[in-house]
Amino acid sequence: MMQVFLALKRMLNFNVPPVKNSTGEPVWKVLIYDRFGQDIISPLLSVKELRDMGITLHLLLHSDRDAIPDVPAVYFVMPTEENIDRMCQDLRNQLYESYYLNFISAISRSKLEDIANAAIGANAVTQVAKVFDQYLNFITLEDDMFVLCNQNKELVSYRAINRPDITDTEMETIMDTIVDSLFCFFVTLGAIPIIRCSRGTAAEMVAVKLDKKLRENLRDARNSLFTGDTLGAGQFSFQRPLLVLVDRNIDLATPLHHTWTYQALVHDVLDFHLNRVNLEESIGMESSPAGARPKKKNKKSYDLTASDKFWQKHKGSPFPEVAESVQQELESYRAQEDEVKRLKSIMGIEGEDEGAISMLSDNTAKLTSAVSSLPELLEKKRLIDLHTNVATAVLEHIKSRKLDVYFEYEEKIMSKSTLDKSLLDMISDPDGTPEDKMRLFLIYYISSTQAPSEIDLEQYKKALMDAGCNLAPLSYIKQWKAFTKMASAPTSYGNTTPKPLGLFSRVMNTGSQFVMEGVKNLVLKQQNLPVRRILDNLMEMKSNPETDDYRYFDPKMLRGSDSSVPRNKNPFQEAIVFVVGGGNYIEYQNLIDYIKGKQGKHVLYGCSELFNATQFIKQLSQLGQK
């Protein structure tokens, strides 16, 4: 999503496109954002990048801020009552030299008048330099992935949408929130999509409202956001994209599934949030004497972003491959270590004082090559250390909870393969947490063509309770299965059983905890998850009972037709899959793998919220307690 990056750069440059190859000093300024703005900016721009754009300070709108009267301020906030009041207060207090007000979503006329009145009252009309609607009310996590919100995400969660006691008004509010973000997304993209969705679902409600909102904007020729120089006019200039709106209820097994690829595992077992992973590291490895206080935990955060080449290359790889690659990178770096020492001595850097590099001038021939090659080598070392720590933390979970065994067993259930161990034995096995066992059983229950008999179910429930499981999620899934059409035709996941290549016995980097012994070296087969199958049918215009009755909307058509018959018979080159009710990295990776083999085609994955299995099972549990 280069468009979002460009839109932010433009905004931080006072809404003027930055001049290419500009050598002049940037204008120094402060950035004032709310939590929504912070969540949009932080996955895309580092503190260093902000500084390069002239941002000397970035502060939360509702924090205590001192006046800096000789510096301009760029605001990036949601147009809420609370935020508008605080901005008016800033004008009255004359905190900054000038004010560039940017709203994440469109501001209403009445709120705009409140700001105008405050500016007049504070005698600050000339200081309010610009007021912009940015239409950036969504969070870009990858070039091809976005999520609606992080703040207040419980308001648009799976639980919120599927509550049995939800009122029509509450449902309208949820749908309007989702539609506002999707509208912003397409304004930023600069494209009007063709919309397809299943009938009788929350996804259909979103489709109807989004179609109406896009249609109304197009009809208002003077104020249409889809004409002229839109930021995104490049990416989809040849053909309009397809928007596939999918309801989470079409597949509840995938979000519960144990996974085997790096990014999805990090999200499943670690604290991974808006592209940042937080790890707890014990200080000191030696064991504490009995009765002594437990060692303090050191908290470390790592950003896993587009600039991390290792992450970009391996985030979709099976975990054993990642472990292997970390080892190879380490060995290749060790071969260059002598070179690093030599370069450091040339540059007069002691030990690990890497901060000194930026202070050095390359005014001698001897230093020139060192200055260019040392930062590259040190960056390589930083990434190796980072991924050694992250992968080691993941590996600890795999080994202590036997996640490879759970992953393989669930794959067999979902692909209807022969099971080598009974489900009761898996639940009774001491390995794995109560939550792991509940996830496994729910996948079995969701995937089975025929629900287990009452006698069998009671046996399973007893085993789950003995294992310490909370049965509330099962109560909800039972109700869901009884009400859903899918009960008669369980979701097919294709034949995806992973192929074991025997056990790992290789010790990874000697002297570290990277020992893969006892972990299955599973090689993934291509999974054909429901979302991927639906996308393939609609993108390639295939006739299939699963998608033949999907509704079709074209906001550019003068009259909205209720037809499910597509006007366009050509396959699509670009598609956006959006899951109403929450998405996950397993689905995202599955779509990325699918599109790799399709030359010239692109897919973006979006969801109303991004949850891991722990967060999802908590929502199912809350629904089951109703």
Question: Where on the chain are the PLM-derived regions?
Answer:
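Extended, well-folded catalytic/binding cores that form a central cleft or groove in large enzyme
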Residues: 1-626
